[in-house]
Amino acid sequence: MKNVLLILFFGLIVFSFTGTSDNYIPIQQDLKLAESIKNGKEIYTDMCMSCHLPNGEGKPKIYPPLAKSDYLMEKREASIRAIKYGVSGEITVNGISYKTRMARLGLEADEIADVMNYITNTWGNTNLNRITMEEVEAVSKN
C-alpha cells in the first residue's frame, strides 16, 4: 500500500510539470500589463473621466459605458481606432445605441495602449492579452 501511494504521489508530481495551460501568461507579460494599466489609469483620469465618469459607466444615451462593455471587449480594433482617430456615427454598446461624437484625443500610441489596457481590465472587464504600442500603430483610420 505504501508503494502504491508513493507511485501515485510521484506520478502526480511528474504529471503536474507536463501540463500546459491556455491561460498561462509569462511573468514578464504580467509585469508589463500591470505597468501599462497603472499608466493608463492616469491617462483615463486626465482625458476620459469627464465623459465616461470615474466608474466607467458613462452617461446614459450620451456617452457609452466602458464598464462591462460588450463593444469594448468584443471590438478591440474598433475601440483602439475610436481613441486614436475619434469616432462619429452610431455604435451599440450593451444593446443601447449611441450617436454622439468623440473627438480625436491626440494621444501617442503608447498612451492609447496604456489607456486601453486600463479600461479593458477595470470595472468588470478582463483582458489578459496586453495591447501593445505596435498593435495601436497598426490600426488605420478606415
Which residues are covered by each model-predicted region?
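Electrostatic cytochrome c docking/interface patches
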Residues: T20-I43, A138-V139
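Axial heme c-ligation environment in periplasmic c-type cytochrome domains
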Residues: P60-A67, S88-N142
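Short alpha-helical patches at coil-to-helix transitions and adjacent helical residues
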Residues: N3, I37, A109-I112
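Bacterial Sec-dependent N-terminal signal peptides
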Residues: M1-Y24, L31
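Active-site catalytic pocket residues across diverse enzymes, especially alpha/beta-hydrolases
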Residues: D70
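A short alpha-helix capping/helix-coil boundary motif
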Residues: I25-P26, C48, E57-K59, N94-I96
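Sequence/structural segment immediately N-terminal to covalent heme-attachment motifs in c-type
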Residues: L33-K59, M73-Y85
